[in-house]
Swiss-Prot record:
One Pfam family, short name: IreB
Record's protein name: UPF0297 protein lwe1516
Disulfide linkage: none
Family named by the database record: Belongs to the UPF0297 family.
Domain of life (superkingdom): Bacteria
PANTHER family: UPF0297 PROTEIN YRZL (PTHR40067:SF1)
InterPro entries: IreB
Amino acid sequence: MDSKDQTMFYNFGDDSIEEDVKKLMKQVYVALEEKGYNPVNQIVGYLLSGDPAYIPRHKDARSLIRRLERDEIIEELVKAYLKNNEIGEK
């Protein structure tokens, strides 16, 4: 069997970043709203591209969002979505 056909496991290991991500996302969201941007569109643009230009410097939002790896933010967003929609672990 080709190794590309096998499922790979991805484990971040540390679940303690949930509160860090939550606090950071709130701050970035507020900064984006205050500047008149659509926060969801801008955050998605940053997470997909890695380009910090999607996040303004207002209220130090650009520096804040770069403190965490994008994959850590995405992991927490997916976990929150699944939990809020009662999908997966109870």
